[in-house]
Amino acid sequence: MTSTGQDSTTTRQRRSRQNPQSPPQDSSVTSKRNIKKGAVPRSIPNLAEVKKKGKMKKLGQAMEEDLIVGLQGMDLNLEAEALAGTGLVLDEQLNEFHCLWDDSFPEGPERLHAIKEQLIQEGLLDRCVSFQARFAEKEELMLVHSLEYIDLMETTQYMNEGELRVLADTYDSVYLHPNSYSCACLASGSVLRLVDAVLGAEIRNGMAIIRPPGHHAQHSLMDGYCMFNHVAVAARYAQQKHRIRRVLIVDWDVHHGQGTQFTFDQDPSVLYFSIHRYEQGRFWPHLKASNWSTTGFGQGQGYTINVPWNQVGMRDADYIAAFLHVLLPVALEFQPQLVLVAAGFDALQGDPKGEMAATPAGFAQLTHLLMGLAGGKLILSLEGGYNLRALAEGVSASLHTLLGDPCPMLESPGAPCRSAQASVSCALEALEPFWEVLVRSTETVERDNMEEDNVEESEEEGPWEPPVLPILTWPVLQSRTGLVYDQNMMNHCNLWDSHHPEVPQRILRIMCRLEELGLAGRCLTLTPRPATEAELLTCHSAEYVGHLRATEKMKTRELHRESSNFDSIYICPSTFACAQLATGAACRLVEAVLSGEVLNGAAVVRPPGHHAEQDAACGFCFFNSVAVAARHAQTISGHALRILIVDWDVHHGNGTQHMFEDDPSVLYVSLHRYDHGTFFPMGDEGASSQIGRAAGTGFTVNVAWNGPRMGDADYLAAWHRLVLPIAYEFNPELVLVSAGFDAARGDPLGGCQVSPEGYAHLTHLLMGLASGRIILILEGGYNLTSISESMAACTRSLLGDPPPLLTLPRPPLSGALASITETIQVHRRYWRSLRVMKVEDREGPSSSKLVTKKAPQPAKPRLAERMTTREKKVLEAGMGKVTSASFGEESTPGQTNSETAVVALTQDQPSEAATGGATLAQTISEAAIGGAMLGQTTSEEAVGGATPDQTTSEETVGGAILDQTTSEDAVGGATLGQTTSEEAVGGATLAQTTSEAAMEGATLDQTTSEEAPGGTELIQTPLASSTDHQTPPTSPVQGTTPQISPSTLIGSLRTLELGSESQGASESQAPGEENLLGEAAGGQDMADSMLMQGSRGLTDQAIFYAVTPLPWCPHLVAVCPIPAAGLDVTQPCGDCGTIQENWVCLSCYQVYCGRYINGHMLQHHGNSGHPLVLSYIDLSAWCYYCQAYVHHQALLDVKNIAHQNKFGEDMPHPH
């Protein structure tokens, strides 16, 4: 592909350049591009042929109408009215208690006074919906606390100071006042009032500004300034009264909320996430249960998440990294219906307790990230915070965000420090067995490479100085969202092909949908203008602009000839004016955003632009609207504005990439189908290895999908693991989105499955950047219903509506994870935010002990994952090699080798575990071999996890019952039984080795209120026993479990073996001849089929598919008229003479046998480049370049002739 500044001759030559592994192609065929005139002879149709084509056109309309009806039947939930309003509880009665014997006690009434003054000063009280605080009833408090404890606290109302002090001294870090009980009841009741308001649809979200705090309070224990656990009571209250099944509790207080954790650590209906200062247990509350290794017990395993900070001075980038890499992916899989935040602000810079360096703007970002969950049902409950100014500003910033104000830009975001990277990596290691979305969330690197990274980080980071925090301000906007559109852009049309996918109706249908939903009326409509000559010349050559302008006066025949000089282009007399108007509209929107006229905007424009090069039109594009808009923004701002361009069009934006590849002020990120270089625009420009050049090295980021079916889970995984970490580190001042919607489900070109809800979430997550200054500019998208619904969903997000609930039917595909990982590996040297890695110790771990545990009942459909703890085993089939990874006790990377987490694949292993049955590199528990999973179960009631009574003792795989055999566990120095078994699986040797695991002194990291006053004693307690009488009782010691017998595992592998061959075909073959599957009827590569239906919880290897033909193909122009002699479906192969199974080429009408006979048609395609062939067996048409079946009205004529010859009658209907 041409680079910036090359002439059009080079541009035309680029079209014939092929991937070295791709079949040869002649000049008559291009991908997603028109055939060059004269390359393939075409006769002029006579009147009879024209009439017949008209008849076939009517038949073809039925299929298109069915597609539209199907899309219209999607449950897009866009008509639902978005809730508005932020609730606030702030009651003066909560200040009626203080420490009687210590006036300097940090938790005092002045905390709420400072907050109230700040909110009044910023005018926030008037913008909120105020709610009267109420007292929590005893019955409500008893949802979490014991009646005896509540009664004891009630008696404090009548105690004198001496008695209060004596009682307080029996607890850790508390004081008591005669009004403490009533204020604690009022604080809990305040949160419950907001729960009623949010779940009762009175408001969208809310904040309870209360004291005393609550997250340290336990079942029967006062602790850490806390009497009653407000968020814990609120969670149980929501479940009991409002029938909420799944609650997410986020605790960002600098102290670990052990009281909340202990309340729910065996409950899969509550996901608890805490990010706190730990310092290897040296920081209060000094509990091992506060470390990353504690993930819950019993059915609650995996539902407790701790990200411990092991040093002070942690910054915004560290907190954001934990949210992006850990919390958000897990929360999306969990699917909470309500989010509660234990919102302590003692991690803010200047707080005497926390000694951290987070900023109010950082907490605004965290709040914004959480607002995308649970349909926006979010409640913040004040916990700690003891620097009055920092506390007031932190509360104010979070409340601004709840109200819909844009997040302030971070002053010095940078990247997470090495200590934060270690903590996040350890948390991911501990959680990966329990959450499908976290599979391969960290990648293994050798210790030598990690040491090189550490040297680089030391050089890059340098000594850190606390920034001088500015006074945060929020813009006063006339309108929130600008909308630019002009019907005149519909004048650009194809004069020769009315069925070309880039039709004028694209923008009309979008605008009609925006108006139907009332979204257009909520936006500020901006009048577009044509781009000026100077604006166009910032990205395009004067010669090219003049050349395109000259087309306005060309005749039809000249326009047709001119169109053939470019890739996939049609030109009409109005093309130049429309392209100029589309680009000018984008520039007008940039002006409105940068001037503060609007916060963000959407440009509904055509023709698209991201393929347009400096001196050449390409791929339906003439002027690169996004690129010109970016340069215009830098021009009017007067400096090299940092601009992030995100291109989520399914095709790689080659033109945009080339225009900024040497410019570090513009970060270009593209997610697109690449298919090993065979998907348009073809070549290697869209590969992950393309990183920019010169000063722009590292500022070009390509996530190259190597297949179809990419959906919400895949794009969000890329967002969390790659796009957002880099974006926050870059810290853009403006975000431009090349918003093509051809990756949407139902699009005829993309073959992907992104939903409108998915696009809404992608948009929302980007809105935290650049102070909310984001502009969406329409690119591709060729299903009118899909693009209309998708743009409407994005517009709602821009307007501040919470993203709709997003149910992910499956985890990310293995192919998607491979693409994301490939890009991360390329870019981790340029972006420190990507260095969340496992460490490969070349010497191996000092201990090979493997401790397995029994999963009582899976709260998620990954039963097998729950059969190993953080000490994981990597199994390599065919080699008999087992790599055991043992985490040292409460360790993190950076400690001694014996305490280092090591889980790695060998160097020569492929990156994906199950490819053609050749290599198996999965944990025993995962057992996803041959494309299926052991013991998958689903719960109809709990999307993100099973209900508490869900039990499983036998798992059915492929129709076979796999009994979980058990053995006795020796505890207290004894070892688990060692079992070794080798059996042949598909020709490979599978060696199952379970190493010894010493369980000396195993304890649970938990305190109990009755036996450990002060919350410091660590005691051993048994796990809850299983409720299923068929399941053997679990071991009473955490970390021990009966093992799966070798015979059971081998039997399951044999059951699953059948799927490995078909799965391996698509992922292991090169994009050359061997991957041109599907020539024979029914022989299409399943990975290239359109997804029709799937079972929730299944991996990509186990999804069920049906072959669905594409309704349009860019290579249909290569179909030539039928020869006068007609077709003979009995004609033998032109090479070998077989009549067994033959295909006819639709360009030259030669007949050859299929790939499963002698493969002569495949050879013909390789020699001629002719793309489309028709099966004489079932009359299906196959396109080699699209790697898909195609059914379009252009094929109906030849299909009907073949049908007549085969059956003696016309086709009754399209099939």
Swiss-Prot record:
Modified residues annotated as Omega-N-methylarginine in this record: R33
Which residues does this entry mark as bearing Phosphoserine?
A: S22, S1035
For region Histone deacetylase 2, the annotated ranges are 482-800
Names of required cofactors: Zn(2+)
Which of this chain's residues are annotated to bind Zn(2+) 1?
A: C1113, H1115, C1183, C1186
Chain positions covered by the region annotation Disordered: 1-44, 445-464, 842-863, 994-1047
PROSITE patterns named among the record's database cross-references: ZF_UBP
State the CDD domains in the record.
HDAC6-dom1, HDAC6-dom2
Name one process (GO BP) from the record: actin filament organization
Q: Where is this region: Histone deacetylase 1?
A: 87-404
- Amino acids binding Zn(2+) 3: C1145, C1148, H1164, H1170
Pathway the protein acts in? Protein modification; protein ubiquitination
Gene Ontology cellular-component terms listed: aggresome; axon; axon cytoplasm; caveola; cell leading edge; centrosome; ciliary basal body; cytoplasm
Q: Which residues form a coiled coil?
A: none
Bias kind Acidic residues: ranges: 449-463
ZnF region ranges: UBP-type: 1111-1209
Textual note on the cofactor: Binds 3 Zn(2+) ions per subunit.
Q: Where is the active site?
A: H216 (1), H611 (2)
Effect after changing H216A: Reduces histone deacetylase activity. Does not affect HDAC6-mediated deacetylation of alpha-tubulin. Abolishes HDAC6-mediated deacetylation of alpha-tubulin
Where is motif Nuclear export signal found? Answer: 67-76
| Domain topic, free-text comment | Histone deacetylase domain 1 mediates the E3 ubiquitin-protein ligase activity. The primate-specific SE14 repeat region contains seven SE14 repeats with the consensus sequence X-L-X-Q-T-X-S-E-X-A-X-G-G-A and mediates binding to valine.
- How does this chain assemble? Forms a trimeric complex in the nucleus consisting of BANP, HDAC6 and KHDRBS1/SAM68; HDAC6 keeps KHDRBS1 in a deacetylated state which inhibits the inclusion of CD44 alternate exons. The complex is disrupted by MAPK1/MAPK3-mediated phosphorylation of BANP which results in BANP export to the cytoplasm. This facilitates acetylation of KHDRBS1 and CD44 variant exon inclusion. Interacts with SIRT2 (via both phosphorylated, unphosphorylated, active or inactive forms); the interaction is necessary for the complex to interact with alpha-tubulin.
Name of this protein = Protein deacetylase HDAC6
The species is Homo sapiens (Human)
